Each structure stands twice: as C-alpha cells, then as structure tokens.
UniProtKB/Swiss-Prot annotation:
It catalyses: guanosine(2445) in 23S rRNA + S-adenosyl-L-methionine = N(2)-methylguanosine(2445) in 23S rRNA + S-adenosyl-L-homocysteine + H(+); guanosine(2069) in 23S rRNA + S-adenosyl-L-methionine = N(2)-methylguanosine(2069) in 23S rRNA + S-adenosyl-L-homocysteine + H(+). SMART domains: THUMP. Its EC number is 2.1.1.173, 2.1.1.264. This is Ribosomal RNA large subunit methyltransferase K/L. Keywords: Cytoplasm, Methyltransferase, RNA-binding, rRNA processing, S-adenosyl-L-methionine, Transferase. It comes from Shewanella pealeana (strain ATCC 700345 / ANG-SQ1).
Amino acid sequence: MLNFFAAAPRGYEYALSLELAELGASEIKESVAGVYFSAPLELGYRITLWSRLASRIIFVIYKGPCESPEQLYNAAYGIDWQMQFSNRSTFSIDFHGLGGFIKNTQFGALKIKDAIVDRFRDDDFSRPNVERVDADFRIDAHFRRGEITIGINFSGPALHKRGYRSTTGEAPLKENLAANMLVRSGWQADKVDLLDPFCGSGTILIEAAMMACDIAPGIHRERFGFDHWLPHNKKVWQELLNEAQARASIGKTRCEIKFFGSDIDSRLVALAKRNAENAGVLELIDFSVGNALTIDVPVESGFLISNPPYGERLGNVTSLLQLYYQLGDKFKAEFGGWSIAILNSDIELLSALKLKADKQMKMNNGALECAFNLYTVHAENTRRVDPANIKIEGDVSDIAVPFANRIKKNFKQLEKWAKKEGIDSYRLYDADLPEYNVAVDKYLDYVVIQEYSAPSQIPEAVTKRRLTDVLISLPSAIGIDPNHIILKTRERKKGTNQYEKLVANKLELITTEYGAKFKLNLKEYLDTGLFLDHRLTRKLVGEKSKGRSVCNLFSYTGSASVHAALGGATSVTTVDMSNTYIDWAKENFALNGLNSDKYQFVQANCLQWMKRTHDRFDLIFIDPPTFSNSKRMEDSFDVERDHVAMLSDVFKLLNPGGEIIFSNNKRKFKMEIAALEAQGMSIKNIDNQTLPLDFKRNPHIHNTWLITHAG
C-alpha cells in the first residue's frame, strides 16, 4: 500500500474525500487544502486519471518531524533517490509552507536540492541537473507545524489542465472548480438537463458532459508526473487508459441529458465549441450566441449553473448590478421548476438577484474567495413574459424611493441652471439624505459617485445595501447609461496614502466652465482634475485678474490659473509639488489656446518656494490641502495649525494694493484673524460669494477669505 496526498483548493476537502472513497481509496484523512489517502499503485494511477477535483496527486515518500535545516537536509538525503529517477532526467522542487526556520520557500527547496545532489554523488552517480520551468521529474515538499512531507508529483502538471482547452477567455474558470460546482450543486447526483447562459469558453458544460458520459478527466492529458518515475508500470497504466476509452465510448452512446450553453460574445462561443470538440463532447452541447436576459428557456425544468461576470471579471460595477437585477427578474419570470446555482465574489451582486438562497457555500476561484449560492425557483411563483419587458433598470418603486425622488428633483432643477450658467459639470447630490451617504457629480453624460465612509456603528452590510440601491436606481432616475456611472470610495487616508492612482485605465473628457475648457480624468485618480465646489472661486479669480500679475499656489491642475489667463492677467505663475498636476495644468492652458512666456509653471514645495522666491504679485490664489504628509515634504502640514505662518509668507509676496484669495476645505476651520491682523492684514470672509448653487446643500464644503493690506 502506498501513501498519497491529493492537493486541492481550500474548501474542496470534503467533496474530494468523498470522491476518493468512491474511487476506492482507503485511510482517507482530510487536511488543509487536500486529503491524505492510501492506495496500491494501480489505484493511485486510477485516481490520477479519474479525479475531477484534485489539483495534483503527490506520492508521499517521507513524512516526519523537521525542526532545523539539518533535519530537513537529512530527511531528503535519507531517501534512495536513484531508485526514484534517473540522473539523466532533469528535476525541480516545489516547496510549500513557511514557519520556524523556513523563512522563505526558496531556502527549503535549496536544502532539499543539495541533499538530493549529494546523495547521488555519494552513491557514485553523476548528479542530475535542475530545470525549474519544465523538469522531467518534480519533487513536492510541504512544511507545516514542524513537520515535513516529501513526495513525488505523481500527476505532473496541474490536474485541472485536462488537455482539451485551446485558449481561454478573459476570465477562465478552472476545470476542477467547474467540477466542484457541479458536485456541490447536486447536479452530479441528479444529472438532469443543464444550462449555462454565461458559458464563456464552455468549461462548466464540458465538465458536466464528461461526467454524464463517464469520460475520465485525465484522458486527454499528454503528460503525467510518473512518466519519468523509475518504478512506473507502463503496462498497468495503458490498461487503465484502454478501460477509460471503452467507458467513454459506451457513456456517450447512453447519455440522454441535454446541455445548453450561450454567451453574448461570439468569439467565446466559437472557443467553447473548439474546447468541446477537443474533449469529444461537442455533439452533446447546444451552443449559441445570445444575451442571457433574452434567451428562451430551453426545457421545462433543469439546472442552471453559471459563473456570471462580477467585479474581478469583465465589468463595471454599476452595469453589473443592473445585469443581476435583470437576471433575478428573468429567473423569477421564466425559470419556474429550475434549480439555479451561481458563483460570485460579490454578495451585493447576488443580493441584487432578489432570490432567497436555499444554500450558501464558500468556494475559491483561484485566490478569490467566492460565494456559491443555490436557489430553487418554484413554478407557481413564475410567469411567462416577453423578453422585451425585462426591466432595463431597477424598479425604483421598491428600492431607494427617497433617494430616487431626491435625485430626480435635483436633476430637474440643476440641469436647467447649469445650461444657463454655462457649465456642463456639477454636483447633483451630496448626502442630502443621511442614509444614502454619497456624492453624485455629473460630468457631461457621465456620473461619478463618491461613497463617503460610513460611521463605524453602521454595519457594512447596510452600507453596501444602500450603495447597491443607489447604483441600481440612478440610471432610470436621470436617464443615464449604466456604463457611464463610475464609483469611487472616499475615506480618511492614513500614513502617506493620500491622492494615489486608482486604476490603470483612463477616461478623459473635456468640460466647459464659463468659457474655459478643462481636461477631466474620471477613473485614474480619486479626484477628477476639477474641484467643482471652487467653480465660483475660479470665476472670481478670473474677474480680478485683468491687468494684474497672478500666482496660483497649491495649483492642482491649474484651473484657476486658466481663468486668470483668460481674464487678462499680465502674467500667471502656477506652482504645485506634483509633476503630474503641473503637466496637467500645461495641458489645460494648451486646451484654451494659452501659449505665452508670461505663463510660468513651477514644480516645487509651495511652502518652501514662497520663502525663497523674489517675485511679487498683484493677486494670489492659495488653496492648500487640509492635511499633507507627502514624501516630498520634510514635515507634515495642517491648515488650521499652520495657516498663520503660511499666510505670513504669502503676504510678503503681495504687491501694494494686491489681494490674496485664501480657501480651504477644512470643516469648522477657525481663522486666526487677530494674529493675521497684527501683521497688517485686512481679513474678510467671502463664503457667500464662492458657494455655487449645486453646493448650497453643503455650506461647509469650503471656506474662503479675501486678504488685503490693512488701511
């Protein structure tokens, strides 16, 4: 009797142990991410050929205590390696596990490699060569809690690589995951008609057809780990292959189950057909190109098992929520008598189905933890509807009614105002209703939703549910394409993590504001390149700039500088610490046809630059951050703590008769007026002049001050 370990993703252990028992294994013991078992050689081969759930099969040679590098070396050295593989074969070592003296897996692998090479040499054999990528013979070592297990990778390449897949789609589903879905859903036991309306490259349907036809999952594989194992019994292995071929031939003739697969992407459907043909089951599966929301129900009852798109796969969160909401409608309307099983990593998407799960299971898709939910749609609760009547957006009659009504009201009022004002970007909603704690900004025909951090006492599930309601109801409330909704999360940043890139892709637009043009980037950063609440402040800067020298400190993307230049400034100096924002400011100037030597752009720490510059200005706009601890700054900056010292430095740059417009976004900011007046400044609050109509609901969004020479 030989000892083996069947490795598998976490969560597969119980189902795998049942599969091993059914195949005839003994002494079965579940472990973390796998199952130990015993079997004679012939059964070890059979399990390698027939296991649908295992990732790999390891033939265990040694298992024992390991508390030091010396013990690890001795354990590996004690194995009679020349009886396992030839020194003419290349080998590699896969080492798993950390802890104790094992600080990294490379160290463990190197120790075992040294022991193997030394053992060959000490037995008067020339040493075999190491080949990391494509070795003939792979050794597997697993270290856990002071114990080392050393074995031979009996199965070779990962067992989910069945050999029938040609190429993959954007988000391929591993074959053993598909098999686990079929087992855990109950389909494998019932073996009824099966539909996958998001079939992609066909993995779920192909695995199901192979199960139904008694086709061994390893029958199409060309390589196994035991190919270069010296005790390999080729005769026994060939007999098992012959048996598997015979069973497959009989199984295909007896299979009466119907399989249906569709996908909206014709390229994926073509790929699924090629994969099914490679697997020998193409004639059993009815593939078609179609939208899951409009397909006809192919049979009266059966199983629908699918892996629809989710956040990590192929989609925008808003359009995905719309999709799941519509899917729920489709299932309830037309799939009476069906069992439905859905794999997804986002419980909010699953909740958008509005179906009660009979069972919820955890199942990993690679490193991604997913929920695998099972539903039963009862026939008496369904109705047949025309596909054209499936809702395109969420029905605001039963979700987020107060939010939807408020958005509609705001939109009706602000859209007319914006056109009259000469702007096409504005704030549509700003946490008007406390339970819907988001800001909604409209940029042309796009919407950016910023989710504020909820108070700690509100459960995360509640905030997610409310955000889902917002995303589902917004498209119909204002008539916007769900794909034009962008979601961002704004929260208190910690450490050095302040304004960082969010995603690699860009979505750039050009917006117009009182005749000025600005570039927006809606996706790449938390902020879009234009602070909408400062719209009137920028306009004021432009109105005060004619015939004056202007300086814009903490300039961000230079939008106030553009207004100054368009307003007739004799010179404009734009200063910011970020190269990215300085370059962005230059782009904004170019957009407005502003190309002149009188426009200067300075990349510098503004606080330091103010101290060393010899330039003087007639108008200075300064809009510092509330707080900053950027790596480029020697010390942190806090606007309330440091504004007196900062404004003292700014005041020194001001020409007689000049003006400073100082603004910041710190709520409950307290201006040290007496300390500033003592330095000869005249201070006037101008909040009422700089708060746009779309921010009247949030009067504390910023505070603005006009500073001049006293007297």
